[in-house]
Amino acid sequence: MHVKTGDEVLIITGKDRGKRGKIKEARPKEQRVIVEGLNIVKRHMKPRGPTRPGGIIEMEAPIHVSNVMLICPTCGRASRTGHRFLEETDHKGRPKKVRYCKACDAVIDE
């Protein structure tokens, strides 16, 4: 996936199109992310004991990763990302793989 937990993203399709938010949770197997405060849905929940009352609860629903675009921390624009290998090596001796912004060519995570 091109985004990780904690990244700031722009929603590019759907009812929240054009809004920005921070990724709260990433689900790589499902290719979905949960963005804080966006894609709010209402769930009708049954009471589950004295600690969890029932009722209509608003919660954030997952969004497919293809519907979000990473906002580059360097240039501040929503842009596509790519992967490249650095000269440095990780703890296993392999080249370190990092994400970079295709608009400004800056490394996103080090």
UniProtKB/Swiss-Prot annotation:
Belongs to the universal ribosomal protein uL24 family. One of two assembly initiator proteins, it binds directly to the 5'-end of the 23S rRNA, where it nucleates assembly of the 50S subunit. Keywords: Ribonucleoprotein, Ribosomal protein, RNA-binding, rRNA-binding. It comes from Roseiflexus sp. (strain RS-1). Part of the 50S ribosomal subunit. PANTHER family: MITOCHONDRIAL RIBOSOMAL PROTEIN L24. Signal peptide: none annotated. InterPro entries: KOW (IPR005824), Rib_uL2_dom2 (IPR014722), Ribosomal_uL24 (IPR003256), Ribosomal_uL24_CS (IPR005825), Ribosomal_uL24_KOW (IPR041988), Translation_prot_SH3-like_sf (IPR008991). GO terms for biological process: translation. GO terms for molecular function: rRNA binding; structural constituent of ribosome. GO terms for cellular component: ribonucleoprotein complex; ribosome. This is Large ribosomal subunit protein uL24. The gene is rplX. SUPFAM superfamilies: Translation proteins SH3-like domain (SSF50104).
